[in-house]
Amino acid sequence: MNYPSNPNPSSTDFTEFFKFDDFDDTFEKIMEEIGREDHSSSPTLSWSSSEKLVAAEITSPLQTSLATSPMSFEIGDKDEIKKRKRHKEDPIIHVFKTKSSIDEKVALDDGYKWRKYGKKPITGSPFPRHYHKCSSPDCNVKKKIERDTNNPDYILTTYEGRHNHPSPSVVYCDSDDFDLNSLNNWSFQTANTYSFSHSAPY
DNA sequence: CGGTTTTGACCCGCGC
DNA sequence: GCGCGGGTCAAAACCG
């Protein structure tokens, strides 16, 4: 499969910054790294046009599978994460940005099975937001899909929560005795953008 | 027939 | 409190 290249490539590698459980430090470092002083009012990681902290622009929807996999790490809106922790919710939130020239249906197909359960108009945006829930039993991962108001060429996909099961269509490992719980290290590279890695007791 | 989408109604947290 | 906006429910429609 051939995906278009990122129109705004960056060679920045945040690998060393991403450690579980020290999100605040991580966030500060990223902001320093991309030279963004005023991050408190507009927490955008890599694209200033959005009010959301975007984990990465992706060119392959399958990349989001790993990010919401059972061993994913936290990145997302700082206040939102704190709020979710207060409410004892899984704090994981990812926002991915996809060029809409990629077929929207392809962007939706991230390897997991989803059930759409809502659609709402958003104030200040001419585009509605779509609500989806993972169809796997007892899995509470949700995702929201909306067009970036400031940049309608892009679609923002927000993931919340960690899947309690591997992706039905993505192979993580071809080992026979593969065990999710014993997989403590993983990494993935987004095409032409950032690479993430994770090592945590999961 | 089983699962998904559609859609308006409902719910609820938050700011005033 | 109360109202607004965002999030969810659920019944009916839809679809392979």
Swiss-Prot record:
- UniProt key word Transcription: yes
List, alphabetically, the GO terms of the cellular component aspect.
nucleus
Q: Tell whether Chloroplast is among the UniProt keywords.
A: no
Which residues, as ranges, make up the DNA-binding region of this protein? 103-168
Q: Which UniProt keywords apply?
A: DNA-binding, Nucleus, Transcription, Transcription regulation
Could you tell me the superkingdom of the organism this chain comes from? Eukaryota
Pfam families, alphabetized: WRKY
Q: Which GO terms describe its molecular function?
A: DNA-binding transcription factor activity; sequence-specific DNA binding
The UniProt function text for this chain reads: Transcription factor. Interacts specifically with the W box (5'-(T)TGAC[CT]-3'), a frequently occurring elicitor-responsive cis-acting element.
Q: Which family does it belong to?
A: Belongs to the WRKY group II-c family.
Q: What is this protein called?
A: Probable WRKY transcription factor 59
Species assigned in the record: Arabidopsis thaliana
Upper taxonomic lineage = Eukaryota, Viridiplantae, Streptophyta, Embryophyta, Tracheophyta
Q: Which gene encodes it?
A: WRKY59
